Amino acid sequence: MDIIQKLTEELQVKKWQVEAAVKLIDEGNTIPFISRYRKEATGALNDEQLRDLGERLTYLRNLEDKKAQVISSIEEQGKLTEELKAAIEAAQTQVAVDDLYRPYRPKRRTRATMAKEKGLEGLANIILLQMTTTPLETEAESYLSEEKGVATVQEAIAGAMDIIAESISDEADYRTWIRNKTLKEGEITSEAKDEKEQSVYETYYHFSQPISKMAGHRTLALNRGEAEKVLTVKIVAPETEILSYLESRVITRDNPITSPTLEEVVKDSYSRLIAPAIEREIRNLLTEQAEEGAIRVFGKNLEQLLMQPPIAGQTVLGWDPAFRTGCKLAVVDPTGKVLDTVVIYPTAPQNKVKEAKATLKKLIEKYHITLISLGNGTASRESEQVIVELLKEIPEKVQYVIVSESGASVYSASKLATEEFPNFDVGQRSAASIARRLQDPLAELVKIDPKAIGVGQYQHDMNQKRLSEALGGVVEDSVNKVGVDLNTASAPLLEYISGITKTLAKNIVTYREANGRFADRRQLLKVPKLGPKAYEQCAGFLRIMNGDNPLDTTSVHPESYEAAMKLLTSLGYSAEDIIGGGLKGISKKVREPKKTAEELGVGELTLKDIVQELEKPARDPRDEMPRPVLRSDVLDMKDLTPGMVLKGTVRNIMDFGAFVDIGVHQDGLVHVSEMSERFIKHPLDVVKVGDVVDVKVLAVDVAKKRISLSMKLQ
């Protein structure tokens, strides 16, 4: 297989782009580095395209390795033909290779292998040839052997039938046809093990769906229901047509002696050997497809959550709500430093609302708090009521935001949190984290395992290694798109920077603590174990504010500094002119980009990036995202009525719709059919996590805590 050609066709890009990307990946370059600094080489393939290419490259190389192993194994057995070798080499999937290898794979002891040991292969061949005019009972007599354990003609014929059944099952073409037929025309069904038992799976108690139309979230729901022993799940294949197909291939002569036996063998081969295997394969295929879809959605949700704009310049009060143990508060200044921590008890069972308000007033006055970040966990509704009442009583203009506290408890009990806040308890750490994730979501959320952030579906049922790899890639891409301040970034944030390992991240922080702030990017080369390759990969993503070189505040790579300086000089500027907001309008002065790029010795795409950075250094792509909805009043679910139009924030996205926070402590669901007047294939085509949207209330069920919303306002 020509892997480069295959990738070119799959990704629908030029062959030279794939060749360049593969070469760069093989040389040890990271995806963010290739995407940002090797645009000319790859034709500006983005990070998503490069990750897809990398994953497929690994799969196809593994496939080629497997083919080589299979060919070698069959050759050692002395059974390799040119035709078989060509078929294996042409196989496009691991399943196709497995089908071709099946007859030659070393087998565990089966009914067929035991029959062969008893010397019944000859009788099986007689039946398969379909030429005999002698009754099978008579043919079988010569295969009787007390020594081999064949006592009767019935045992001999049964053994021969087992051999034929396995040979039919091992036929690659048959399996391919049956698999495709079942995928195209089969159904997946589920039944309740106990219909009287109430469960979240009631939708699937009498469920049937064509395999070809099976939605990923339904597959994952069936898998979970089956694992919890609530459902029985089956694949229903077009059996009559499949048996007819097999008989037409196996029974080639109308022989009254062998045909009835072969009909019986075909049924046995299909029901006992082929059907269970095909069912497993199809269930696995559906699960893989569902998991990939769910991981893709999870990744998109995570990216959008990480890329939410920071709220800079405000002192924030982080509020971790609780009942019995009290609400933990943390005052965090605009730099993320914790100024104070307090515990108040406005909720049951203590209900010390008056005392809590007095404490809050003092904190707001003392630290000039302008924003409260309230976690959405237990007791958040009661806490919000206290906040709203307080805001009406004080002269200061303070607003609040309800933030997801998913993962905050995981972080607060972690080794990292203990190192960061050694004198705080878990509640105080959690409150600080809740405040910081509003100030800078990216910097705070990277400290938490992406799987704990709570924007996925069925994440605990998936292949955890694959999920971790995919989500790690999303975090890496997000961190590198934004870039980090080399002098303030934490080790967990630095870990995600291109080319920086966990060890290097710790070494950078240790070096910074021992030697003071970095004044120049080149100082990175003094960090233990950070060599030229790591420097090349990471330098452009690490910013130095107020350093020796103004270009260090930009994402211009040091390898392009000479070109950037030549450009500045030719336009009558110096590097110092970048300081204080950049060179507005510089892009208009570069009138002949192709000629200018040639003169500077860089590509046009690199020149464009340099100009963009000089025009607006340290620009933050998150600034273009919708900002959180700041609130000063509260709604109750009972206040909602159909037809009411509200502003809300998209909190999570699933295959079937989006959950929107409208400020009533219960996210409402906008079903995919209610997102637009036009047909929508997937919610991600319309919305993303963090989007602020106008929604209309369709229905409210207070008892079941369900709110149905629509984005179709007309």
Task: Kindly give the residue locations of the regions a language model identified.
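Duplex nucleic acid-engaging cores and interfaces of nucleic-acid transaction enzymes
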Residues: 49-51, 59, 63-318, 322-412, ...
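Short beta-alpha connecting loops at secondary-structure transitions
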Residues: 18, 341-348, 371, 413-426, ...
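Long, charged amphipathic helices and adjacent flexible linkers at domain junctions
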Residues: 281-299, 452-483, 598-642
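Low-complexity, acidic/Ser/Thr- and charged residue-rich accessory regions of DNA metabolism proteins
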Residues: 139-153, 207-208, 245-270, 274, ...
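Accessory alpha-helical DNA-binding modules that contact the DNA backbone or grooves
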Residues: 30-31, 42, 46-147, 481-624, ...
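A glycine-rich phosphate-binding loop feature that marks nucleotide/adenosyl-phosphate handling sites
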Residues: 179-188, 319-323, 377-379, 403-410, ...
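Long, charge-rich intrinsically disordered scaffolds of nucleic-acid metabolism proteins
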Residues: 96, 401, 407, 412-482, ...
